[in-house]
């Protein structure tokens, strides 16, 4: 047992003199490992008489626990010191400015849609929606578009079959509203529409807002005043507006609406092709045939309708020269509209 006491004293002295964790690990292996000195002492129990083994074994276990306890305590001190040094080296200067979170923003097309809807709801219009997959009747027939009209061509319309297609305008929503409600009707119909066309000013899918007002004694002056006020509020400036005679199957009379170029104030530039004018929408008085097919008596009621491309207005408002930029999902472009 004297040898055991000497061995324990030697081990404790080695633990106290250790200068780092690596040295402690070597001491642990030397005294407590599988081939460690204290472990070897335990293996000598077989040489002792049977009656002495329990007592001697208990003493050896106490010795091992003592060395293990001191070694672990010393190890904990080194680990705490090492952690403190590491934390000190990696300290954060909380006075430095933080990165902050980048906030998102509405897509310019969404902004434009909301701006249009806000104006018309403010003057008493409701918002109506309808299916994007339409039948031939509501997309063409009910809007006085004859079978030989170019819009029915496969080159301009996406067909599923002979009767079902992707709507080419939001006018079917107007028809469905007139079929289900009695005048007076005041609605705008925002939504996605689809046409087989793609270039810098056209996309196979784009957004459109169409408006409809049906009531007694509605005339072209009401239409003219509504559109002029909308353009003034939307572009936040006084703009000259002109109505050019045009043709749409679902309105009579029909007109294209031009406004003074917002880029050059009507002086002529590349955007307006040196004319000083920009085409912004189509409009007209609702054709009697359209009213009649929707169950409204054209002798008693009249109305006007208009339609505008949302991307077109967004391009003019924000000075964007390629419609396809709106759908490229390039954050460098979209971040400009936050």
UniProtKB/Swiss-Prot annotation:
- Top class in the EC scheme: ligase
* Single GO cellular component term: cytoplasm
Give any GO molecular function from the UniProt entry: magnesium ion binding
- Localization of this protein: Cytoplasm
* InterPro entries reported for this sequence: aa-tRNA-synth_II, aa-tRNA-synth_II/BPL/LPL, Phe-tRNA-synth_IIc_asu, Phe-tRNA_ligase_II_N, Phe_tRNA_ligase_alpha1_bac, Phenylalanyl-tRNA_Synthase, tRNA-bd_arm
Q: How is the cofactor bound?
A: Binds 2 magnesium ions per tetramer.
- Aminoacyl-tRNA synthetase found in the keyword field: yes
What HAMAP family does UniProt report for this protein, alphabetically? Phe_tRNA_synth_alpha1
For this entry, the protein name equals Phenylalanine--tRNA ligase alpha subunit
Query: Encoded by which gene?
Result: pheS
